[in-house]
Structure formats: C-alpha cells, structure tokens
Amino acid sequence: FYKGDKCRLFAWLGDISENIDGLLYKKDLQGTYWDYTSRINNLTKEGNVEFGNGKKPIDLLKRIIALYPGDEITVLDFFAGSGSTGHAVIAQNVEDGGHRQFILCTNNQNNICREKTYIRLSNVIKGYITENGKIFSPMPASLKYYKVDYVPISERLYYEYADEIL
C-alpha cells in the first residue's frame, strides 16, 4: 500500500510466521523459480543438450527433492521433456549419498525422449564438457530406456492372458 509518496509492504503475521508450542517463528522464503534461473548461465543448454523452452533449473528441483525427509524415494515426472528431474535426482544422490530413483515418462513427441532426455541423462552419468570448456564430472547412476505402447487385444485374449499370469 502507499502512504504518501512511499510504497509500504504489508503482510499478515500468520502468513510470515508459525506458532510452535507458544513460540512465534519467522518463516523464511525459500526462493522462487526466477531466483534459481538467474544463477544459471544458460538454462537452455544444461546437461549439454539444447532445449529451447521448458527446462526446469536443477538447483530448484534438487531443493524440492531435498525437502522430502527420506533419501530412498522414487520421483515420478510424467512430463519428462529434457530430463531435468532425472538430472536433479542423480545430482542430489551424489551430493548427499542418497539412493533415490526416478521414473520419467513422455509421449515422445518429436522424438524428444531419444534425442534429448536419454542423451542428457547419459551425458550426466558419463560426464561432459560444454562448448565453453566447463567440465562436468561423471555422476554414478544407471539408466534404462523402455518404450511402452498400446497393444489392442480382444476381451477374450485379455482374460486368457490374465489367467496365465495368475
């Protein structure tokens, strides 16, 4: 709000603090998407794979992953795109010795999985050198690529197959 010619910031105490056992604690802002992108020289080339739009900053994803108290979780990203989530999981495991896993899914539009996601994660695991000469050390991890597709079957075949499995 404005008081005279000066702009004043106004916030409700309940929005910026937390009451724990009768003590009032100030909440700290953890940052925004833009705080994380400003730290990165060129977000579009992260992981040594060119990707114009939609890459999520690794530092931001690592921060989100680290908020979960355990280090043996499986992180699911069903809009995988450039593979940022997988990159962040691998990097966070290297940083804190965790055993997290990830599952990345995509509809493979424009062959994105084969040409971007897989190559990026392979680069992260093997290590790479950027075109500017910056060296990224290998990060130990394993990577498997599966192609899943719809296979139409008749209802009768479906139940026969289900009986075989059971």
Annotate each language-model stretch with its function.
Residues 1-74:
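Class I S-adenosyl-L-methionine
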Residues 58-130:
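Conserved S-adenosyl-L-methionine
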Residues 91, 95, 158-163:
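Hydrophobic alpha-helical segments
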